[in-house]
Amino acid sequence: ALKACDSKLMHKSDAGAVIIGIGGIDHLVAAGKTLFARYPNLLIEEMVTDAVCELIVGVRQDPVIGPWMMIGSGGLYAELLADHKVVLLPVPNDDLEELINSLKINPLLKGYRGSEPADMSALLDVLQSLARFSLEKRDVLMELEINPLLVRPKGKGVCAVDAVLQYARAS
């Protein structure tokens, strides 16, 4: 996949700033010319094709309640399904699993209609890493969002496709 890197692009696919299914060097060069005409910086990424589902994961710092994490259906479904849950940090794995089980997209993670179940161990590891990072950087990190976070079949891990970090401005 080839995508534009521009801090003003929140939804790259909506802006036509992502080209997928690149089949070789000639296609890559042509795709690069197309995107370079509009964007100065591009990123080449491996195309992950075996995702069980796409999640959105965000952590934010609230001055009153402290750090919290949002988890939900991601990618194209993030806004369409309005399927997300919020939890205060830190959070034990049992509570994270319960939260994930309450999502509409959870059947996909379990292996819906004979499909492979998701790598829940890797998903929980990444969520806990994000929680720890958020707590360690609570003085400077305002927000971090990954969308989509591709959850792959058991034993294959997860893959963050796109992420946005916002740090507090120095005063």
What are these regions (language model features)?
Residues A1-S171:
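ATP-dependent carboxylate/acyl-activation modules
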